[in-house]
Amino acid sequence: MKIFALHGLPTSPRLWERIQLPEGWTIDAPTCPGLGLDGTSEDWSLDYCVEQLQERANRADILVGHDMGGVIVAMMAKPGQRVVLSGTSLGAVYWAGIRMTALPLAHRFFYAKYAGKRFLRQGGLPEHADDLVDAFGDHGPGWGDRMRRIAKGMRPPNDLIERLDGCDLHLAWGRSDPWYPARIYQQLSRKTGAQLHLLDAGHFAPWEDPVGFEKALRA
């Protein structure tokens, strides 16, 4: 069984490192295009990511997407594929709010000041806070400004939920996720008919509860 898994940080591959897969299963967990050491261009976009990753996603039996990676995975999914989404939103209104954080005043608070550290420290269960910062907190120089460029480019298609029609859709969610709380996964489950798996985790469910996440992959 081949898994394609995508997060939305330069440290993306580490999100999946604690998951113990069944024998014979493999995982392809690339860094999201434009988030590597080569930097993030001012015109970075979700469509660019899809162009770079679609061929690899087509070879997978299971597509797994977390946060921004969930949006990109939903854009690439084909009918018949199993799709597992975690800690994300497919709604246009949510991402319109994220684009607002790229504006000058908001950018200084969200990105220039904290550079994602607050998102990490307050996103997981309290006992995981320090370990999450250690695992995911170093994104290289200029990360605050790169986050602004990414936020500006978060323009998913309006029919994102409809694109998952015909997929075997599962939601593997941290029950204590503060950034994508219950109303988001409940609405997504209701609109898509997805099977919901609630895990003992905050936002970073694949890393915080790898055993529960692995069970969701096999469900």
Question: Could you tell me what each predicted segment is?
Answer:
Residues 65-69, 73:
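Gly/Ala-rich beta-loop-alpha elbow adjacent to hydrolase catalytic centers
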Residues 112-164:
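Conserved alpha/beta-hydrolase catalytic His-Asp/Glu region
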Residues 201-214:
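Catalytic histidine-centered segment of alpha/beta-hydrolase-like enzymes
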Residues 1-39:
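Conserved HGGG/HGGXW glycine-rich cap/lid loop of the alpha/beta-hydrolase fold
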Residues 4-8, 66, 173:
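The conserved beta1-alpha1 loop
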Residues 82-110:
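Flexible "cap/lid" loop of the alpha/beta hydrolase fold
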Residues 28-62:
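Active-site loop/oxyanion-hole signature of alpha/beta-hydrolase fold enzymes
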Residues 149-187, 200:
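Conserved serine/cysteine hydrolase catalytic core
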